[in-house]
Amino acid sequence: LLSIVAASMTLAACNAQSGYKVTGTIEGMPDGKAFIANFDGTKLDTLAKSDITNGAFEFTGKVSEPTGAFIMVVGQRFSLPIMLENANITVNAGQAGLNVTGSEGQKIYDQFMALNMSIQQEQQKLMPEFQAANQAGDQAKMQEIQDQFQKVVEAAQAKEAELIKANPDSYVSTFVIVSGMGQMEYEQLKEKYSLLGEKAKATAHGKAIAAQIAKLESTAIGQIAPNFTVTTPEGESISLYDIKGK
C-alpha cells in the first residue's frame, strides 16, 4: 500500500511539473496564427505558438516560473492577459468578457482587473459631461469633472496597493506593476516596488521593475494626473493640460 501511495505521489509531482496546456476560444476570431508572449516592460518574448481554427486554439509548453503573459493574434490589435503556470488553463473570450480558469494566479489577477474596470466605468460615465462642458466652454466644470475622476483613480490605486501588500511575493503583483509602469513616474513606481517581497523582486518581472526605477531615477518628477482629451467641433484636440496651460 505504501509503495502505491508513493508511486501516486511521484506521478502527481511529475504531472505538476510537466508544463502548461492552454486551450480556449476567441469569439468571432478568423482563422490565423496566435502566440503567447511574455512582456518584460520593454519587449515581447514569444513563449508558444498555435493555429486558430474556428476561433479555437491550443498552446503547450513549460515555464521556469509562473508569469503573466498575453495571448496575441498575428495581424490583429488584440491581446488577452493570462496568468501562465504549469497547469491546464482554459480561456474563453467573447462579448461577455474574458474568462480564464485553471490558474491560481488568475484569481488574484481578476481582483486587480476589477479595480481597472471600476476606473474605466467611471471614465465612460463622466466623459459625456466632460464633452458637454468642453463644447460650452465651461472650464470650471471641466476641472470639477477631472477632480472627481482623480478621486476615483486614487481610491482604486489605494486598493491596488492593498492587494499588492496582501500578495507581496506573487508573480501576479509584479506583472500588474510591469504592465503599467510605462505610465508611472519615479516615485509612484518606487512606492509600488517597495510593497513587493524579496521573492517577487527576484523574478524576471521584479528585476524589470528595478531596472525601470533606475532608469527613471535621474529624471524623477511628480506624478502626472490622468488626463481627458476630446475633439472640439472645429476638429481640434484639447486636453485638461491644454486648459491648465492657458
PLM-predicted stretches and their roles:
Residues C14, R77-S79, N99, Q106, ...:
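N-terminal targeting signals for export/organelle localization
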Residues L1-L2:
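Bacterial N-terminal signal peptides that target proteins for export
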Residues G245-K246:
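Loop/turn elements at helix/coil->beta-strand transitions in domains of secreted/extracellular proteins
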Residues K207-D242:
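N-terminal "domain-start" segment that seeds a small globular fold
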Residues C14-A158:
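A non-transmembrane, solvent-exposed segment enriched in polar/low-complexity residues
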